[in-house]
Amino acid sequence: VGIQFKLIIVGQEFDTEMPIFTESRNFFKDEIIHMGYCKSFEDYASWLWKADILPVTINQEFFGASVMEAVYCNCYPLLPKRLTYPELFNDRVNALHFYHNTNDYDNKLKSLLINQNLGHNLNEITQKYDWSTMSIQYDQLMNIT
């Protein structure tokens, strides 16, 4: 198809690299601009702020903190319609951010890569999890205020 893109893969590294990461590193060698662990939160956040699209394919997730961090940095999430995501991101209001199966995922990701005008803003979702909001709730729960 000839769609041009760059790839950022951040995450923990282990002593032995999983075969899928070795294969990805080789297959996408010209597209990868960063792959691996970030030594500081600032480094991690800087990569998130550089990203446009966050394709999520994870099979197990309890809250989705890393997804929420990326969305806070204005990444457009493409999420499976399962796990915690429909509740966190209101799948009825934000239906375009969700895919139902592999074919739907492929089509939506291709469309996002071609149509760079993403036109999204999910700040109202991330704001309620921002520390400035959460700290007040924690203080109230612990009767600190």
Task: Annotate each predicted stretch with a short phrase.
Residues 11, 19-42:
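Nucleotide-activated donor-binding/catalytic signature segment of Leloir-type glycosyltransferases, i.e.
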Residues 45, 63, 68-72, 86-87:
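Short alpha-helical segment that forms part of, or immediately flanks, the ligand-binding pocket
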Residues 45-51:
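Short alpha-helical donor nucleotide-sugar binding micro-motif in glycosyltransferases
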Residues 54-55:
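A short hydrophobic beta-strand element within the catalytic core of glycosyltransferases
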Residues 59:
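Aromatic "clamp/platform" in nucleotide-sugar-dependent glycosyltransferases that forms part
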Residues 76-79:
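Short hydrophobic beta-strand element within catalytic cores of glycosyltransferases
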Residues 91-103, 111-116:
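Conserved acidic donor-binding segment of nucleotide-sugar-dependent glycosyltransferases
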Residues 100, 113-145:
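A charged, aromatic-enriched C-terminal amphipathic alpha-helix characteristic of glycosyltransferases
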